[in-house]
A protein has these predicted regions:
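Central regulatory/effector-binding core of bacterial HTH transcription factors
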Residues: 93-156
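Beta-alpha-beta core module
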Residues: 157-163, 167, 232-285
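Flexible hinge/capping segments at coil-to-helix
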Residues: 161-169, 173-195
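N-terminal short secondary-structure element
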Residues: 1-35, 68
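Secondary-structure junction motif
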Residues: 193-217, 289-294, 298-300, 304, ...
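Hydrophobic hinge/microswitch elements
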Residues: 131-136, 141-145, 151, 201-263
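A short LG(V/I)-centered, amphipathic sequence patch enriched
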Residues: 40-61
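Alpha-helical linker/hinge and terminal dimerization helices associated
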Residues: 42-46, 68-90
């Protein structure tokens, strides 16, 4: 019996719905069903009543399931308590520096700080704001910060990335752009626009985005007006009406009254599927407490903690 199986069981038992539980637990429904079945086989009894008359993957607890739910919760609580005690002993009087790309939404940053505070109450997290995502990687690589929050795919060697969230791409444009009044923009509607980008080496998913545009029957790369080294310059170029740009939906634009970001759809109206991954970065030779914090972020993504910053 694994703690993971107990978490899965509690998740389904609380929602009484495999579909809802699978989303909260970040696991596919088939995998969730398989783990529950393995747990039932080990216990030698069914924990849920499954009926074809029950629609939408809903279930109800058996009598054994109701009794096991209370015990499973106790086991998980004891496990979490043991982990907290060990962490408190091993992380006393520690100071960790967290560097963040300054355009990440404040809610994401505060969520990460609260998450660390809840799991590492004796660790002081000092926040450092950095102007662009590349610099976050450079600072981690050069040991100027311990952890980094950024949206850029790895370009620096010696780093380890832990995904904590993902975000849809949107189109950043000036508010007087002809398409700014639409609820969403079809990618093919941008075939005549000029583009601002960071370039092949440091751009966010540069090749994937170019391929998406080719699928929409136009070449974005040949329409790129200018490559810029930072998001500040990218925004400045767009404020001047020099083009449009792909940006993650989680970037903070509250201080940009002249700019607006729009959701993207495919030509058939379906949502644009390309997403950008948000990472916590650490150096591969980080001190143990930093590795533990990154590992906790990874575990949090696959758990049910409502405070998790990527939820």
């Amino acid at each position: 019996m694994e703690l993971r199986q107990l978490k899965y069981f509690v998740g389904v038992a609380e929602d009484l719905h495999f579909g809802k539980a699978s989303k909260k637990l970040f696991v596919s429904q088939p995998a969730l069903s398989q783990q529950i079945k393995l747990l039932e086989n080990e216990l030698g009894t069914e924990l849920f009543v499954r009926s074809k008359r029950i629609q939408m993957r809903q279930v109800v607890l058996t009598e054994a399931g109701e009794m096991f739910l209370a015990e499973a919760k106790n086991i998980l609580q004891l496990s979490e308590k043991a982990i907290r005690i060990v962490r408190q002993i091993s992380t006393r009087q520690k100071v960790v520096t967290l560097g963040v790309f300054k355009l990440i939404l404040p809610e994401r940053i505060m969520g990460m700080l609260e998450f660390f505070s809840a799991h590492f109450p004796t660790v002081e997290v000092k926040l450092v704001e950095l102007p662009n995502p590349v610099q976050v990687q450079e600072f981690v690589a050069n040991a100027q910060i311990d952890l980094g929050m950024t949206v850029l795919p790895l370009i620096s060697k010696g780093l380890h990335a832990v995904q904590y969230a993902e975000a849809d791409y949107t189109i950043l444009m000036k508010r007087d752009h002809p398409l700014a009044g639409q609820d969403a923009v079809r990618l093919e509607e941008l075939r005549s626009d000029k583009w601002i980008d960071h370039g092949r080496e440091t751009g966010l998913y540069f090749e994937q985005l170019n391929e998406a545009c080719r699928q929409a029957n136009f070449s974005r790369e040949s329409n790129i007006f200018h490559y810029v080294p930072s998001f500040d310059l990218l925004k400045s170029m767009i404020r001047l009406g020099k083009g449009v740009a792909f940006i993650p939906a989680t970037l903070d634009l509250t201080q940009e009254p002249l700019l607006i970001s729009k959701p993207i759809t495919n030509s058939d109206g379906t949502p644009f599927k390309q997403v950008v991954i948000e990472h916590v970065l650490i150096h591969k030779s980080s001190q143990p407490i930093v590795e533990l914090m990154a590992r906790t972020v990874k575990q949090g993504r696959h758990g049910t903690n409502p405070q998790y910053p990527g939820k």
